[in-house]
């Protein structure tokens, strides 16, 4: 009974920070339910929420930075829409207090796990769209990301590893890299991935580890990019 009251209080606080009050509170509960809880969970919600988030931030950047190219806008969006930023935002909103987790996840500190927090944020954007409509969900995203977009500085945003490697290979007219899972160590909720990055005709393959597939791919891409720039530096055009 006490846990129910605490969850209700947490959900009320989350809605206040979202700037939106749910008519159907069960949608918010599902958005905050991890698959380990063995109930209606939030994975399908994430699918919709990810699209809402990416579109909205893309439009915000499009309007805020009229002189940036498509590639520059994509990199800037990647610096704002990622697991780290979403998890940070969720922590600021105390989303972890409102999560429904299975016993194993709860014991291992799942309410602090960045991937779980980030997924819950995306799921909540979807839940708002289901409870109201797309425009309302867009307003919620704009409300949460307004300050971050205002502070965004393209010149200080480092390209993510995979994007930088792709552009470097294209500039040298080589095929795109291939990523493959070489090994997955540990259990589903506490895994370590080993990913290989293969540069094909260049004959270079490297491996990297990460706590998620995406993180490992980024690290492998950075290693491959370092090798590429050392072995095949681009000649600067004379002015």
From Swiss-Prot:
The protein's enzyme class: hydrolase
The chain positions of domain RNase III read 11-133
Binding residues for Mg(2+), per the UniProt record?
46, 119, 122
Annotated active site residues, numbered on this chain, are: 50
| Gene Ontology terms for molecular function | double-stranded RNA binding; metal ion binding; ribonuclease III activity; rRNA binding
What are the GO BP annotations of this UniProt entry?
mRNA processing; regulation of gene expression; rRNA processing; tRNA processing
- Where does the record place the DRBM domain? 160-230
SMART domains associated with the record: DSRM (SM00358), RIBOc (SM00535)
Localization per record: Cytoplasm
Its Enzyme Commission number(s) read 3.1.26.3
Task: Give an example GO cellular component term for this record.
Answer: cytoplasm
According to its UniProt record, where is this protein mainly located?
A: cytoplasm
Q: Which InterPro entries match?
A: dsRBD_dom (IPR014720), RNase_III (IPR011907), RNase_III_dom (IPR000999), RNase_III_sf (IPR036389)
Checking PANTHER family in the record gives: RIBONUCLEASE 3, RIBONUCLEASE III
Family membership: Belongs to the ribonuclease III family.
Question: What is the stated purpose of this protein?
Answer: Digests double-stranded RNA. Involved in the processing of primary rRNA transcript to yield the immediate precursors to the large and small rRNAs (23S and 16S). Also processes some mRNAs, and tRNAs when they are encoded in the rRNA operon. CRISPR (clustered regularly interspaced short palindromic repeat) is an adaptive immune system that provides protection against mobile genetic elements (viruses, transposable elements and conjugative plasmids). CRISPR clusters contain spacers, sequences complementary to antecedent mobile elements, and target invading nucleic acids. CRISPR clusters are transcribed and processed into CRISPR RNA (crRNA). In this organism endogenous ribonuclease 3 and Cas9 are required for correct coprocessing of pre-crRNA and the trans-encoded small RNA (tracrRNA).
> Which proteins does it associate with, and in what oligomeric form?
Homodimer.
Protein name per its UniProtKB record: Ribonuclease 3
Question: Organism, per UniProt?
Answer: Neisseria meningitidis serogroup C (strain 8013)
Q: What is the lineage of its organism?
A: Bacteria, Pseudomonadati, Pseudomonadota, Betaproteobacteria, Neisseriales
């Amino acid at each position: 009974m006490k846990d129910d009251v605490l969850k209700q209080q947490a959900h009320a606080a989350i809605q206040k920070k979202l700037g939106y009050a749910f008519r159907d509170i069960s949608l918010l509960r599902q958005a905050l339910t991890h698959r380990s809880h063995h109930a209606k969970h939030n994975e399908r919600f994430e699918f919709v929420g990810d699209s809402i988030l990416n579109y909205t931030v893309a439009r915000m950047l499009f309007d805020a930075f009229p002189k940036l190219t498509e590639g520059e806008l994509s990199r800037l969006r990647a610096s704002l829409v990622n697991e780290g930023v979403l998890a940070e935002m969720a922590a600021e909103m105390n989303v972890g207090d409102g999560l429904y987790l299975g016993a194993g996840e709860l014991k291992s500190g799942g309410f602090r796990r960045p991937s779980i927090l980030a997924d819950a944020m995306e799921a909540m954007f979807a839940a708002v769209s289901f409870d109201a409509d797309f425009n309302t969900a867009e307003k919620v995203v704009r409300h949460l990301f307004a300050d971050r977009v205002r502070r965004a500085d393209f010149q200080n945003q480092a390209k993510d590893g995979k994007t930088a490697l792709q552009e470097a290979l294209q500039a040298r007219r080589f095929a795109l890299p291939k990523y493959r899972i070489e090994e997955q160590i540990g259990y589903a909720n506490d895994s370590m991935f080993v990913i290989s990055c293969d540069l094909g005709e260049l004959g270079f393959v490297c491996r990297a580890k990460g706590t998620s597939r995406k993180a490992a791919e980024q690290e492998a891409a950075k290693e491959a990019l370092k090798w590429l720039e050392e072995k095949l530096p681009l000649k600067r055009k004379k002015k």
